[in-house]
Amino acid sequence: MKKQPQQKERVSRWKGTYFKRNFVFILLIACIPGLLTGGAIYFLSIDKVEKELQRSHETQVAREVSRMDEKLGVLELALTQMAYDSSLMNGLAERDLEKDFTFSYQLTKKLFLLRDQQPLIEQASIFLNSPRPLVLSPEYSALTEQEALRKYRSLLASDHSIYWKRSGNQAMLIQLIPGAAEKPFGAIMLAVDPKEMESILQSLSPYPDGSALLLDQNREVLFHEGEKDFEKTLLHEIKKQPAENGHFQMEWKGKVYSVSFGEMNRMHQQWTFVSAAPLSAITAPMVFLSKVIIVMLVICIGLAVCMTWYASKKIYRPIQHLLGLFTGGEKKTWQASGQDEFKWIEKRWQDLSLESRKLQQQLLRQTPHMKKSFLQHLLQSDFYYDNEESLRFRMEEAGWNIGGNVFHVLDLQVTGLRCEKSIFREGDEQLAVFTLTNIAEELAAKRVFQLSILDIGRLSVTVLVMKTNSSDLKAYITELARQFGDVTGLCLTSTLSSKTERVTEIPSLFQDVKCGKSRRKFANRDQVIDLQADFPRDEQFAPYYPFELEKQIVQTIRLERKQEAKELIDGCMKELSEKAAIDRHVHSALIQLFSRIQEDILHSGLNPSELFQHRNPFLDISELREPNEAAAWLMDVVVTPYLSKLEGRKNRQQKQLAERVIAMIHEQYMADISLESCADALGMNSYTLSKAFKQVTGINFIDYVTQIRIEKAKELLVNTNKKIHDVSEEVGYRHNYFNRIFKKQVGMPPGVFRQMYQETP
């Protein structure tokens, strides 16, 4: 009972002059423009629109004719190219296709390919008159019937090397071969698909009652699309026209048709195209539409009066809604104050704006952390199920200004921490990355583009770059590397992804960069890896590995020659950096070398986990970026601890004995050498010698002799032409036993091994 007087008072307050004025104003806005537009369309524009539609139809016909001419031209060009293909046509007259299956297959394949590439072709075939008449259609078929042979030979009597010919109800394109010869010995024949041509002709007259024709030089119908009775009348009217091209109007069955016709030059022939469209179908929709507009306007006037009344009642509702939003629980306070609605809204707006600014300042302080967190989750594909619009919205919320920018992912890898020029040392990795981040941000600010940097550890940072134009991004990378090197003495490897306009593709770019950075050269110098560029095909070959150096390194480690092992490892790293070149190949080689050394460690009875202090050597290898660093890691982490452990387990006399035995094996491996003979020569027990030899080398005496003999046999098989029997005798084996032991050790007989390596370029 208390709310009813307030409801009445509120309604009577806004239904006054403001309501009436707005009612009349809205009614005028709704009615007058529509009446003026409808009248202008109906009384002034019908004639112009009809002419414009007619011109538009003629333009469409010309455009579709041009497309049809282009498609036929492409067909002719494809046939000509095949006729002048020297790899197929040279010597074709002398080839016996019945016996030369390879060449017949190539011709048949070419015909299939030509038919598949050209949708206009229904059938492609080749007729050869010599050395024996035959047809490839595209299957091989000899011509024995004289009537068929006479029909095909008549194709060769044309004065033109390429021409169109009507064959029954089908049009064929004929190319004589060879194209430039006076006496052709064959022809390539393409039969045009009538259904495809009907589809093309349909575009000349897309109206339901329209028709389109394509006539040859004798004005006979080649292709048609439409009603046959109408086409006969249309053809009769075309033949009466004195001009070669133009347009006219004709009447048929109470309908007026607009007819356009013209000529097309097709290989020394003049074809005629005809397009007929009902004029009523072109212009009637506009007349009908204008009448509909007038009727609708009359109806709309009545509706406008009702809707204007309803809309005017709704005009005050936005103000009422705003008051509800801004007043909240203070509605009674506003009513008691008697203040104007808009002034009250203005006051509340200012209060809310002040609160909003405070919240924005707090948000700005958290924005860098939000950006890094979002970028980290984005790169890790944590937003896999989010769509593009959602990700863009979240990025803009996090503080990025995306706009029309394109995205690049850039990986910056710092190298040279052990270099003499470096101002940093081990343990300063975070400081080096911090310096790089500052220089990158300052340089980006000067070049006016956005970037976000994420430290992913191991002296590497990932950068998300946003630019409207990526043309100067390489210049930025070059300048960044130069400034960073001048300040720190370190080198920088930059891996640049391809560009994308989609946020959802950024994780894929990050994965590409992670894989692509392994293409860097294994050297301490500034490098730029642009994943948009094509890389040399050489990188697809098998990576290089110095097997001989590996043997020498392992042997020197077995003999505990630390300095010699260091020199060999330095040489190996230098050779790998020059020949294996890129990171992933060098890392694979390092893993192989490490595994070989670890095998010896296991043979010696040591536990690699305890020796390496439970660290992950393979992870360490993946982080090596330069030869000096790799050599130092092998010596410091692998060789030196291993040799230190061995010093307390082996005595010098055993090593000297092993060295003397190894020397004897290398000198006498081709003879009947045995452990007993070596023990007799050294004046000691064979059991003691065997135990000492295995403790030093990691393998027993027989296996070592077998290994030396097999390696020598491999060298003789690959580098000489000696018989396998002679090779077996030179390495100290009988022929039959040599084959068995070689296959057991290598996995294949010696003959197969020689053939495989001699065939390898």
From Swiss-Prot:
* Pfam families, alphabetized: HTH_18
Q: Which residues lie on this side of the membrane: Cytoplasmic?
A: 1-22, 307-761
Which regions of this chain are Extracellular-facing, per the record's topological domains? 44-285
Which of UniProt's keywords are assigned here?
Answer: Cell membrane, DNA-binding, Membrane, Transcription, Transcription regulation, Transmembrane, Transmembrane helix
Would you name any one GO CC term?
plasma membrane
- Which SUPFAM superfamilies does UniProt cross-reference here? Homeodomain-like (SSF46689)
**Annotated localization:** Cell membrane
Its biological purpose: Probable transcription factor regulating the pathway responsible for rhamnogalacturonan depolymerization.
Q: Which PANTHER family match?
A: ARAC-FAMILY TRANSCRIPTIONAL REGULATOR (PTHR43280), HTH-TYPE TRANSCRIPTIONAL ACTIVATOR RHAS (PTHR43280:SF28)
Question: What protein name does the entry list?
Answer: HTH-type transcriptional regulator YesS
**Can you name the source organism?**
Bacillus subtilis (strain 168)
Q: Tell me the gene name.
A: yesS
